[in-house]
Each structure stands twice: as structure tokens, then as C-alpha cells.
Amino acid sequence: MALKIRLARAGSKKRPYYHVVVADARSPRDGRFIESLGSWNPLLPKDGERVKVDADRVKHWLSHGAQPTDRVLRFLDEAGLAKRDARSNPKKAEPGKKAQERAALLKKAQEDAAAAVAAAAAAPAEAEAATAE
């Protein structure tokens, strides 16, 4: 039997509340579960009451082979109960093709403007030097 530590939705419409449960992977999301391990209230602001988890029971089920889902693994990582691997997606941080084109155009425009200012500053100096001779 494949066990999952996952979220079971409770609460009413537009007011979600989740229970952290251990359940068979084949059972429905809000269906039968083996044990309730805690809760998550996403509507609360960031405080200690937002996520509540029974650490001893989580350790017990992890030692028995229960696999946490991604969201639950985030909670367990914050609580120091499980280690979440860092994702390596370096292309995600790079700007898109259009943004790169816009940045190149902006850089070229700034360089042209700087060159024009330098040329304008040099022109009166040359005129002054020519009149002084």
C-alpha cells in the first residue's frame, strides 16, 4: 500500500481549510484517510497558527515509507522535519526573448544619447579653439 502525506480540503466555498493526512495514494483527495497529522489554513496571515503539524507522528509515518506531496514537503522543510531538494532551473531566471531585445534597444539608445552629449560638448570646445587662433 503506497502511503502519501497530503492535504485534504475542508471548509466552505471560497474559504479553504486543509487537513494534513496520511492516506493511501489511491483514495480520493477528501476521502478515507489513515490518520490526521495537522492542518493548514491558507487564509491566515503568515504566523505560527497557519500550519500546524504533529512532528512525532510525521516522523513515524516518514519512517514507515509515506511520501509527502510537494506542498506538504514545503511545510515539513520549514518545520525541519524533511529536506526538500532545491530545484535547478537556471533558464527560469533569464529574461525572455522580447525582454532581451528591449534591453538591447534601450542600451543602444543610451549609448547613442551619451555619444550625442559628448559630441555636443566637444563641438563648442573646438569652435572656441578655432576662434582663439
From Swiss-Prot:
One of its GO terms (biological process) is translation. Residues 83-102 are annotated as: Disordered. GO terms for cellular component: cytoplasm; small ribosomal subunit. Pfam families: Ribosomal_S16. Residues 83-101 have a biased composition (Basic and acidic residues). GO terms for molecular function: structural constituent of ribosome. Keywords: Ribonucleoprotein, Ribosomal protein. The keyword Repeat does not apply. The keyword Ribosomal protein applies. HAMAP family: Ribosomal_bS16. Belongs to the bacterial ribosomal protein bS16 family. This is Small ribosomal subunit protein bS16. It comes from Mesorhizobium japonicum (strain LMG 29417 / CECT 9101 / MAFF 303099) (Mesorhizobium loti (strain MAFF 303099)). The gene is rpsP.
